[in-house]
Amino acid sequence: MMMVRRGLLAWISRVVVLLVLLCCAISVLYMLACTPKGDEEQLALPRANSPTGKEGYQAVLQEWEEQHRNYVSSLKRQIAQLKEELQERSEQLRNGQYQASDAAGLGLDRSPPEKTQADLLAFLHSQVDKAEVNAGVKLATEYAAVPFDSFTLQKVYQLETGLTRHPEEKPVRKDKRDELVEAIESALETLNSPAENSPNHRPYTASDFIEGIYRTERDKGTLYELTFKGDHKHEFKRLILFRPFGPIMKVKNEKLNMANTLINVIVPLAKRVDKFRQFMQNFREMCIEQDGRVHLTVVYFGKEEINEVKGILENTSKAANFRNFTFIQLNGEFSRGKGLDVGARFWKGSNVLLFFCDVDIYFTSEFLNTCRLNTQPGKKVFYPVLFSQYNPGIIYGHHDAVPPLEQQLVIKKETGFWRDFGFGMTCQYRSDFINIGGFDLDIKGWGGEDVHLYRKYLHSNLIVVRTPVRGLFHLWHEKRCMDELTPEQYKMCMQSKAMNEASHGQLGMLVFRHEIEAHLRKQKQKTSSKKT
């Protein structure tokens, strides 16, 4: 039994060994039959059990690595060549720009584009800050102030006329005309932009433009302040634009409501009843009937003719149902500075806009809005340049009669001049007048106190708006320079008197009148002798 069992186990062992050998043989045959061949014999991978398999793998890998390394090196060389060519082209372009700018006299920064753009924006904003848009700049003298010019759609009102230009004229130069048109169009584009639109928004056109003022500072740029009609009565739209010798920059877009802005017109007076009667006729028409937001303060010196002045006020009050006036009587010698100072301090209401005026001033209702729009408490005071009328007796000497006053108020070179040396007419809030210290009451006689106050504002941080206005006139009256004046005051008085009489050409005709008459007599004699 044991022998049989041993034989069976030996037989089974041999069968298992044979099966294992058979499986191994089949596996070897399968590997030999299914080994992949390359397209080329030298790229065929050797078998793992081959005696050269390891060396073959290393050789093929080294060859592939070398090919990859060569390809990468080639790409790097091409990229480097492209970078070098791009840098060379950029340098050529930059040098060309610098040469062009140098030829034009410009100095451009050769910094990277990002830095250059940032520096440019910073520079433009610094130009806006230096242009007295948000705050005033302290100035040494009144001659350092840069005045504004004013303009409408048709006319420009300018200070610098020379011998060929006119105080009021249509802009003849194309660059000036295009400049102002561009400013108005830029403002209209802003007003009609989607950001400004609202459910009740209406389109703005050039007909809504009222007036603008502008001034150019050669080291900064041009500042524009444009005023448009608002959506309601007594409402306005004002846009402040700045051209820093380049594109216009929008600085502010303000909505201004002047419906409740009261103006206190202060007039110092002594005698001059006829002039006061004429002034009150203008005041009634412009302030009471048209504007309706004005208070009148009359500061009267002395008692002579005081009843006549009071009678004119009372008659105007009854006829126009006007009660907004104050009459202050002072003793002593007339002093314009003292009268204005007392009138300003006498006001007991809230902060009010003051208009320092004279009895020989004519103004329109449009000027009153100009006064409101160019003042702001704690920030801005208005010193308009008025148009001063020449002596009508000289201007219209060749006419049969002098025309009515309204027909005389024409802004032309032959009829008057911009009184750019006068600082008496001014609009400023009472708080600013008090804070600046008011007038210097130690100054006696003619002139001086106005310039002193003006200089104090120039030395402060308030913005001083100085511009000619088309609705403010100084009516001619004979000027007497008293012997009691100091030499400096007397000189100023005589200069003012000479300026008030006539234009340069008209005065020349008066100076050479005798020569002209002699020439006419000779011509007449020659004509008579030829006839005989």
UniProtKB/Swiss-Prot annotation:
It catalyses: 3-O-(beta-D-GlcA-(1->3)-beta-D-Gal-(1->3)-beta-D-Gal-(1->4)-beta-D-Xyl)-L-seryl-[protein] + UDP-N-acetyl-alpha-D-galactosamine = 3-O-(beta-D-GalNAc-(1->4)-beta-D-GlcA-(1->3)-beta-D-Gal-(1->3)-beta-D-Gal-(1->4)-beta-D-Xyl)-L-seryl-[protein] + UDP + H(+). It comes from the Eukaryota. It is found in: Golgi apparatus, Golgi stack membrane. It holds the Pfam family CHGN. GO terms for molecular function: acetylgalactosaminyltransferase activity; glucuronosyl-N-acetylgalactosaminyl-proteoglycan 4-beta-N-acetylgalactosaminyltransferase activity; glucuronosyltransferase activity; glucuronylgalactosylproteoglycan 4-beta-N-acetylgalactosaminyltransferase activity; metal ion binding; peptidoglycan glycosyltransferase activity. Keywords: Coiled coil, Disease variant, Dwarfism, Glycoprotein, Golgi apparatus, Membrane, Metal-binding, Signal-anchor, Transferase, Transmembrane, Transmembrane helix. One of its GO terms (cellular component) is Golgi membrane. Residues 57-100 form a coiled coil. A divalent metal cation binds at residues 360, 477. Glycans are attached at residues 315, 324. It is a single-pass type II membrane protein. Ubiquitous, with the highest levels in placenta, thyroid, bladder, prostate and adrenal gland. Detected at low levels in the other tissues examined. Transfers 1,4-N-acetylgalactosamine (GalNAc) from UDP-GalNAc to the non-reducing end of glucuronic acid (GlcUA). Required for addition of the first GalNAc to the core tetrasaccharide linker and for elongation of chondroitin chains. Important role in chondroitin chain biosynthesis in cartilage formation and subsequent endochondral ossification. Moreover, is involved in the metabolism of aggrecan. Belongs to the chondroitin N-acetylgalactosaminyltransferase family. It is linked to Skeletal dysplasia, mild, with joint laxity and advanced bone age: An autosomal recessive disorder characterized by skeletal dysplasia, short stature, short long bones, advanced bone age, joint laxity, and facial dysmorphism. This is Chondroitin sulfate N-acetylgalactosaminyltransferase 1. It comes from Homo sapiens (Human). The gene is CSGALNACT1.
